[in-house]
Amino acid sequence: MPKLRSATSTEGRNMAGARALWRATGVKDNDFGKPIIAIANSFTQFVPGHVHLKDMGSLVASAIEEAGGIAKEFNTIAVDDGIAMGHGGMLYSLPSRELIADSVEYMVNAHCADALVCISNCDKITPGMLMAALRLNIPVVFVSGGPMEAGKTKLSDKLIKLDLVDAMVAGADSNVSDEDSAKIERSACPTCGSCSGMFTANSMNCLTEALGLSLPGNGSMLATHADRRELFLEAGRRVMALAKRYYHQDDESALPRNIANFKAFENAMTLDIAMGGSSNTVLHLLAAAQEADVDFTMADIDRMSRLVPHLCKVAPSTPKYHMEDVHRAGGVMGILGELDRTGLLHTDVFHVAADNDGTPGSGTLKSVLAQYDVMQTQDEKVKHFFMAGPAGIPTTKAFSQDCRWPSLDNDRQEGCIRSREFAFSQEGGLAVLSGNVAENGCIVKTAGVDESNLTFVGSARVYESQDDAVAGILGGEVVAGDVVVIRYEGPKGGPGMQEMLYPTSYLKSRGLGKACALITDGRFSGGTSGLSIGHVSPEAAAGGTIALIENGDRIEIDIPKRSIKLAVSDVELNARREKMHSLGPMAWKPIGRQRYVSLALKAYAMLATSADKGAVRDRSKLED
């Protein structure tokens, strides 16, 4: 039987000092010997997705203590990618993922916690905590802050739905009046919560459900809805149940590495492709798989992208549906249910929402779907749960409303979630492309690509940084038929692998959204749509071919064939490569870029791998 990790600091006379300190935190005589559950919160007033999390740790703690545990909360950092976007602040976003993972590891291991609840929400916080949880491999439950309500406003007497990207595009579009732009800005983000579309934050919170590490509704239940309160309480109860299974019953199925195994990663990626999730999820799943020692790679993602249909289309890929609509249609469990009916899901994997009593099928995703898939459940409480809807009242308060949709969206032919027969497309919403531009692959969110752009041939317009690209787009340098190439923005080259939401938004605002392509060794916001190809690997700073592209080069993109090709002969490419090598210390570096890179970012760049490895640390540089 495994011994409580916390016994290291609570048992024996030699730990009298440690016990004295535990007592000073509120631990009583009869508490010693109970499991100590760490609560990793990420409350901050900087981020709308986290501004309401201040009291969530206490809520989880109350359930833990009622179930017989000791709850101890700590906080970690959270960067708002939207606020950090478009300036030097974005250099810090992806590196913050590693800091979050490390900070959770440091706190949990320094204090010998027995189990963990992760209260996350936005872009790098859920992935960072996920990496830490799989690194630590102690019982864990994830519970996020939830998505914000979609914005709504009237323009030209027509009610429209809005999100953050609409505000950015309107602000850059000279054809939109100052009055309408201000109206959109004030309406785009009406409540607390992660941005309302299938952007990175919501994509990752959905994926934790598919990985088996969070409860049904985690990815889709609105932050403002009163029903979300129960998710926090249940997270506390579930983590205690998992801790008891592991420490009292020697049940290793309660550990995250036995839940999030290879099959679970396939389930998560299958969901991601089916719902057209953010391309950033590829980066984060690859990173999490490395922490879990799961051999899940770009090759697996490429294979799956050819098999999985696109069953759920959500903003930014369409203005019609947002996360509140996904929830009404059954949330993640609704999508997984449809995938199960197509034979594309592993349902024999363990899940934190299910009790494992040793009987066949218990504790698995199959039993969770039986209860929570709205198309098969007989549980009226579950149906009531998925009818939770928006109130349309601006607020920063969690659990502030209890509005319901009049009915569930069970329309699998024309609704938000479709059956395979009526899929938005028979190939999913993400694809891996490869070719001489990206020998190790690159990612495109096909859910956001217009059908007319699935194949594209154009002339390269090369920029050495996002800043130069923005200036070029706004200055009229980019014209229809161009392939905008933004390089030296990868994990090493940026450093930090900036998101390119501003360049794509500005292309849209100038009417070039369907007339141009954009490729980069950087990445894209979950809010990006259009022919935007990111994660080019190897990156320019690591000797990738993207560094050798010249203005006017012909670039051929063929998404159905999964190819991206620089139409330059091997002889010419080799000559360019030799010329680059001849530059010595200046080789594989941006020409003329003016950018301050702090010591912290330089340290990150020294160990960062390219995107095809998840942009994690290069372990070969750390291990003997």
From Swiss-Prot:
Active-site annotation: 525
GO biological process, one term: L-valine biosynthetic process
Cofactor: how and how many bound: Binds 1 [2Fe-2S] cluster per subunit. This cluster acts as a Lewis acid cofactor.
Gene Ontology molecular function: any one: magnesium ion binding
A GO cellular component annotation in the UniProt record: cytosol
Role, per record: Functions in the biosynthesis of branched-chain amino acids. Catalyzes the dehydration of (2R,3R)-2,3-dihydroxy-3-methylpentanoate (2,3-dihydroxy-3-methylvalerate) into 2-oxo-3-methylpentanoate (2-oxo-3-methylvalerate) and of (2R)-2,3-dihydroxy-3-methylbutanoate (2,3-dihydroxyisovalerate) into 2-oxo-3-methylbutanoate (2-oxoisovalerate), the penultimate precursor to L-isoleucine and L-valine, respectively.
Subunit (UniProt): Homodimer.
Protein name: Dihydroxy-acid dehydratase
